[in-house]
């Protein structure tokens, strides 16, 4: 997932961010978070974490001294970082491909075209997934062949595409959407944010089978990114506050954690491990 200025990305220095890791627990449908630990801890852009199916590692995007964006891997057991891709192009938004030993990325090609690509698990054998849909900014896998994509434009559109038909254009199902796309656990649906300057932003979901869009809950202030726990709780961050919304109980958002005492500022992206026991947090150290 790239930020809003995707089209000028190569000419713009990305913001300095780190990735933190914390224990995550759910008791009585309420989330609690352990003390976050900075696992990247360096100057520069480390962002867009996504856990591998094992839950023992996550992939993320890192921009190093040469200004190139490549994919890196953090191993939770060894507490080590390894580089996965080393290409002339820039890769963003690494995401495991369902039922395949590999991952997908948004790749910025030499002519600045942004399309969806796939790599083997070791970062080799790059190949296009969708030929005709561009410029892709963000995306989520709805199942092992259905993709839901944020496609840049004025306004940006939510499009659904089939990886088995790479030459086809996407089907537009919503317009003027936010950047956060997440598969909904237990359902063939993907959540997204519908932006509305009058009524406010809403978290909604699209059923990938029938293309039906359903409102879920109004988004909390300052929150741009949303993630789901395996048991259907949605997490979002605004500033240094972590909020939860329970899709089973409904109701309003609840504040469940404040990261300010732990030295974090401007919390943005979140990622939940497949078992729901770890939370990756993208933030800026308060002292930076």
Per-segment meaning from a language model:
Residues 9-288:
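Sequence signature of WD/YWTD-type beta-propeller architectures
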């Amino acid at each position: 997932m790239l930020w809003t200025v995707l089209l000028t990305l190569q000419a713009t220095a990305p913001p300095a961010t780190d990735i933190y890791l914390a224990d995550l627990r759910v008791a009585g449908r309420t989330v609690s978070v352990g003390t976050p630990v900075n696992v990247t801890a360096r100057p520069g852009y480390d962002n867009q974490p996504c856990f591998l199916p094992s839950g023992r590692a996550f992939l993320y995007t890192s921009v190093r001294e040469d200004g190139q964006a490549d994919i890196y891997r953090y191993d939770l057991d060894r507490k080590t970082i390894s580089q996965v891709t080393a290409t002339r192009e820039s890769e963003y938004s690494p995401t495991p491909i369902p039922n395949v030993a590999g991952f997908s990325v948004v790749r910025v090609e030499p002519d600045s075209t942004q399309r969806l690509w796939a790599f083997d698990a070791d970062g080799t054998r790059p190949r296009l997934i969708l030929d005709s849909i561009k410029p892709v900014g963000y995306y989520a896998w709805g199942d092992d062949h259905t993709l839901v994509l944020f496609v840049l434009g004025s306004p940006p559109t939510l499009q659904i595409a089939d990886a088995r038909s790479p030459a086809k254009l996407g089907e537009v199902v919503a317009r003027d959407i936010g950047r956060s796309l997440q598969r909904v656990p237990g359902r063939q649906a993907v959540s997204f944010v519908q932006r509305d300057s009058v009524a406010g932003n809403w978290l909604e979901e699209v059923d990938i089978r029938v293309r039906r869009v359903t409102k879920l809950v109004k988004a909390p202030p300052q929150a741009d990114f949303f993630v789901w726990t395996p048991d259907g709780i949605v997490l979002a961050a605004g500033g240094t506050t972590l909020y939860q919304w329970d899709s089973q109980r409904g109701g309003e958002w609840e504040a469940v954690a404040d990261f300010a005492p732990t030295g974090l500022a401007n919390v943005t992206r979140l990622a939940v491990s497949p078992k729901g026991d770890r939370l990756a947090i993208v933030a800026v150290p308060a002292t930076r």
